[in-house]
Amino acid sequence: MLRFLNAGESHGPALTAIIEGYPSNVKITTDRINKELARRQKGYGRGGRMKIEKDTVEILSGVRFGITLGSPITLVVRNKDWENWTDIMAIEGDSTNKRQILEPRPGHADLTGGIKYGFYDLRNILERASARETTTRVAVGALCKILLEDIGIKIGSYVLSIGEKKIDKSEIESISYEDRFNNAENSELRLPILGKDEEFKEYIDKAKEDGESLGGIFEVYALNVPVGLGSYSQWDTRLDGKIAQAIMSIQAIKGVEIGEGFNLAYLPGSQAHDEIFYSKERGFYRKTNRAGGLEGGMTNGEPIIVRAAMKPIPTLMRHKSLQSVNVITKEPFDAAKERSDITAVPAAAVVAESMLAFVLAREILEKFGSDNWIQIKERIEKYRQDVLNY
């Protein structure tokens, strides 16, 4: 089974991921992974850290002469900011009082993590809880995208809202997914409509002046996914559940919906479901996609559509702070302040692409085998033909 573990602290020496179950005979380049890492770092409203880090990956195992071996793949991304934190984040030696965090930030892992793991210096919590961890998720996601793209599956994302500033749904319904993606790639905020950046940037600038941070909503999709990934047979084999968990695991994500999601609760049954049609050329298909490509916990051949809501980042600017309590003195105190973003919704959308890619790649390998990619592709092609002939 395809799986990965990652490790590393936000200001430690490096971030590492080990991927197990990745098939052999897949062509891999660091350039492809680095391209995805660069996409994660883009976005108007990001903090000063993005000016320091220019993430690039090192492959330490599992690849020889650009071809995967079927053995575990080890990826490393060095933290360039580590040189400024060597004393504070030293592996060995005596502890230091420098840059201690004693006032937990509401909305972050600080306080609960400190209680759970027995630390008063909450830096021991926030360093791992930080969204910097998603760097390796994107690197792993790049490997998964390589598999998916080789069998015609395309994954993308775009931002629908930041704070109260929204893209009207009617504005994008007539635009193809390809154009939405291309527009998002050329937007500093991953907006699917051209010409909207400036008004959104002005809104973000105002939030910065007010010392605020902003959340938002993004949409991630997958096209040309085969019918029948996932299963209705057990609660934990339903693919919509796996996708929702993967997206919810991204820092600051507080809500996920698939297809029309919560809107379906307001519709009568006659308007909520996607009617079924058939043609010899297309096989079975739908004219609508309210289900978001998933029925009964399985893919139905339509595009997978997932939306996620990201809360505002808990770290506020220095001239505005939330009320907290010092964990040592128990006295009221302003919450700790760290260098942070005003908004990271565009970056979260890219991370969500990677998580969706991982879940789909894992399902593909579970259904069609996971040893040799050359053989796996042959099975997938035959299966697609069987589906068309059904």
Curated annotation (Swiss-Prot):
CDD domains: Chorismate_synthase (cd07304). Its cofactor is FMNH2. GO terms for cellular component: cytosol. NADP(+) binds at R40, R46. The keyword Lyase applies. Pathway: Metabolic intermediate biosynthesis; chorismate biosynthesis; chorismate from D-erythrose 4-phosphate and phosphoenolpyruvate: step 7/7. It catalyses: 5-O-(1-carboxyvinyl)-3-phosphoshikimate = chorismate + phosphate. Keywords: Amino-acid biosynthesis, Aromatic amino acid biosynthesis, FAD, Flavoprotein, FMN, Lyase, NADP. FMN binds at R128, A129, S130, Q251, A252, G296, K311, P312, I313, P314, T315, R339. Its EC number is 4.2.3.5. Coiled coil: none annotated. Gene3D superfamilies: Chorismate synthase AroC (3.60.150.10). Reduced FMN (FMNH(2)). NCBIfam families: aroC, PRK05382.1. This reaction introduces a second double bond into the aromatic ring system. This is Chorismate synthase.
